Curated annotation (Swiss-Prot):
Record note on modification: Deacetylated by HDAC1. Acetylation and deacetylation regulate its transcriptional regulatory activity. Under more reducing intracellular redox conditions, Cys-381 is in its heme-bound state, which is optimal for recruitment of the NCOR1/HDAC3 corepressor complex and repression of target genes. When subjected to oxidative stress conditions, Cys-381 undergoes oxidation to form a disulfide bridge with Cys-371, also triggering a ligand switch that results in release of bound heme and derepression of target genes.
Span list, region Disordered: 13-90, 215-246, 263-282
Regulation: The heme-bound form can bind gaseous signaling molecules such as CO and nitric oxide (NO) and NO can reverse its transcriptional repressor activity.
Record organism: Mus musculus (Mouse)
Biased composition (Low complexity): 13-47
Protein name (Swiss-Prot/TrEMBL): Nuclear receptor subfamily 1 group D member 2
Tissue-specific expression: Ubiquitous. Expressed abundantly in skeletal muscle and brown adipose tissue. Expressed during skeletal muscle myogenesis.
Conditions for induction: Activated by the CLOCK-BMAL1 heterodimer and DBP and repressed by CRY1.
Location of N6-acetyllysine modifications: 162-163
Length: 576
């Protein structure tokens, strides 16, 4: 009697009277079963079966005893099953909803789902050895038409291997089913190499486009220029290709923008010894003097980094609920809905007209989070002057003091963004959305140097250092710890000013920000900045190609920090 390999045996007893078991057949792991009138026992030679292979007793207990005694001569390993509802008995049988699954190759009881099909331990090991050892079996003497069953599966190995492939066993599943650690590392290296090749292919495509444009321009050159030796022209073009010109120009412009707009970095280096940090708990006068826009202030030192620390002009009327902070250079910062944007005065008015007025109270201008522990209010953000705030101050005064110290840093981010090549070509709507969503991440990158991993200290903008333990005792929570961890990893890369400026631009210009209208334009600018960053990294670190990959992996970390920051602000309520 020939067994139908790959079937599933189901035992059904509707009454106490004797009845023959019905067999169901399944193709693969699909759960569609087809009834058949012929019974398919798991072991025809069992002592509990008659000459036709049918069980002597039809009750479920005796049949279960047949199955349990069937494979006692061949111990198998039990493992996890892949499908829900699938169980495995102590003898190695795989059951699905009470039905026993058979090996797709030989019809024996399947021990699990191996290499893409349900198979027994014998066929699983046979197929694995065949693939791993690349065994070439002897040719079949019966024209490769042998019937593979449990009793004769070892007679013709070529037909057995052919049957394994025909029922769906996968060669790749043998090679990559359970990947060792070294193999995974090797595959990751290959994937990174493939990514580099793909990027180089994209770069070559851009170079071809540049070459076509160059040929078009050369067609309009004078005849004498066209008659110059081709080799001489090629040598000149190799030295400075149009693509290289573009990348170098982007690198130079972004670097200059970063240096010119990151005033804290310059003043901290040049005037740290001249500037005196404010005392802890320093109060700001309640009666704010209105700032005279016509007055010229050209001070130096870290105090000048906060030009509106004692000067602020509040507008009323149509801008009620929005704080407009003016600066001597004719620019202003609009703080609305917790976001800070810096543009010219006319530009600020246009932007503010688009921002809803509702829900813009002082308590919603949350550019850092406050902690209320034991009745004492503390400000624990490095972008402020000090983590300490006088507990006698009202919530309004606390936010006012913080916004005064924090807003100029945001102003610098906006100035930096405006000087990124191509940023101002984006729509006004997309510029605002990129600044809203990315300002915190840019500041996180810029002020990463404030975190000292060795001393476990954080330097605030006032110049004072505080230990992490002290900040935690003041109420700093998981956000500050995550900021410290990120800064430690970023500082370990030891990026130059050029590399830091390009990375900051890449952080800001992200096409997956919410609310972007022209995604293609933002993506094009983002790709330009990423290519420039990669060129700079490869130039400065030819033997450390992983730095570029590590930098790109910092982008999701920054996004997580941004989300944590937003959650902290939304969860906190200022108590006046």
């Amino acid at each position: 009697m020939e067994l139908n390999a790959g079937g599933v045996i189901a035992y059904i007893s509707s009454s106490s009277s004797a009845s023959s078991p019905a067999s169901c057949h399944s193709e693969g792991s699909e759960n569609s079963f087809q009834s058949s009138s012929s019974s398919v026992p798991s072991s025809p030679n069992s002592s509990n079966c008659d000459a036709n292979g049918n069980p002597k007793n039809a009750d479920i207990s005796s049949i279960d005893g047949v199955l349990k005694s069937d494979r006692t001569d061949c111990p198998v390993k039990t493992g996890k099953t892949s499908a829900p509802g699938m169980t495995k008995s102590h003898s190695g049988m795989t059951k699905f909803s009470g039905m026993v699954l058979l090996c797709k190759v030989c019809g024996d009881v399947a021990s699990g789902f191996h290499y893409g099909v349900h198979a027994c331990e014998g066929c699983k090991g046979f197929f694995r050895r065949s693939i791993q050892q690349n065994i070439q079996y002897k040719k079949c003497l019966k024209n490769e038409n042998c019937s593979i069953m449990r009793m004769n599966r070892n007679r013709c190995q070529q037909c057995r291997f052919k049957k394994c492939l025909s029922v769906g066993m996968s060669r790749d599943a043998v090679r990559f089913g359970r990947i060792p650690k070294r193999e995974k590392q090797r595959m990751l290296i290959e994937m990174q190499s493939a990514m580099k090749t793909m990027m180089n292919t994209q770069f070559s495509g851009h170079l071809q486009n540049d070459t076509l444009a160059e040929q078009h321009d050369q067609s309009a050159l004078p005849a004498q220029e066209q008659l110059r030796p081709k080799s001489q022209l090629e040598q000149e073009n190799i030295k400075n290709t149009p693509s290289d010109f573009a990348k170098e120009e982007v690198i130079g412009m972004v670097t200059r923008a970063h240096k010119d707009t990151f005033l804290y970095n310059q003043e901290h280096r040049e005037n740290s010894s001249e500037s005196m940090p404010p005392q802890r708990g320093e109060r700001i006068p309640r009666n704010m003097e209105q700032y005279n826009l016509n007055q010229d202030h050209r001070g130096s030192g870290i105090h000048n980094h906060f030009p509106c620390s004692e000067r602020q002009q509040h507008l009323s009327g149509q801008y009620k609920g929005r704080n407009i902070m003016h600066y001597p250079n004719g620019h202003a910062v609009c703080i609305a809905n917790g976001h800070c944007m810096n543009f010219s005065s006319a530009y600020t008015q246009r932007v503010c007209d688009r921002i809803p007025v509702g829900g813009c109270s002082q308590t919603e201008n949350r550019n850092s989070y406050l902690c209320n522990t034991g009745g004492r209010m503390h400000l624990v953000c490095p972008m402020s002057k000090s983590p300490y705030v006088d507990p006698q101050k009202s919530g309004h005064e606390i936010w006012e003091e913080f916004s005064m110290s924090f807003t100029p840093a945001v102003k610098e981010v906006v100035e930096f963004a405006k000087r990124i090549p191509g940023f101002r070509d984006l729509s006004q709507h997309d510029q605002v959305n990129l600044l809203k969503a990315g300002t915190f991440e840019v500041l996180m990158v810029r002020f990463a140097s404030l975190f000292d991993a060795k001393e476990r200290t954080v330097t605030f903008l006032s110049g004072k250092k505080y230990s992490v333990d002290d900040l935690h005792s003041m109420g700093a929570g998981d956000l500050l710890s995550s900021m410290f961890e990120f800064s430690e990893k970023l500082n370990a890369l030891q990026l130059s000013d050029e590399e830091m400026s390009l990375f900051t631009a890449v952080v800001l210009v992200s096409a997956d920000r919410s609310g972007i209208e022209n995604v293609n334009s933002v993506e094009a600018l983002q790709e330009t900045l990423i290519r420039a960053l990669r060129t700079l990294i490869m130039k400065n670190h030819p033997n450390e190609a992983s730095i570029f990959t590590k930098l790109l992996l910092k982008l999701p970390d920054l996004r997580s920090l941004n989300n944590m920051h937003s959650e902290e602000l939304l969860a906190f309520k200022v108590h006046p």
